[in-house]
Amino acid sequence: MDPNVLKNLSLMLSRRAGVSGGEPPRMIEWPEYGQRSEPCGSQTVWYVDRPVGAPFIKAFASEVEERGGGILIHAGKVTFDSAKKLAAMKEVQVFDVKYFSFDLMAVVPEHSLWKRPGDKGYPEKTAQSFPKIMASDPVCRYHGFRPRDLVHVKPHDVYIVC
């Protein structure tokens, strides 16, 4: 894995955890597919440098069952059927390697979670009146924001993720 990708991945993981800096995950060889992180944290990171097709999906489904959720970073092509199956795996976030070629947070305004549905003070009746930001937005995916979360974009306004 490219050291720059690993550095930016560790920045993302540390920002999600709310700490500064942070150690990059130790990547070990994942035979036939690429690399994966050692099972020390709560999330596994998989890096695939080959095309993602049906044989990969079969192996990956059993891997997710065994290790739980995590992040899949792919550097090769993904077939349409594989993309649909990966999207159906709710416990896995899928990123193209290009998202980690630079530090995304250095080029966009600061985003922070304000309230989640069910939190005390969440404005159920007026939440839909906030400006909208898509859950597929790279920054929302980067931070792990979910639909209906209220996100504060500094210095601007509060947005609802839809």
Swiss-Prot record:
Q: Which InterPro entries match?
A: RPB5-like_sf
Say which domain of life the source belongs to.
Answer: Viruses
- Designated name of the protein: Uncharacterized protein 028R
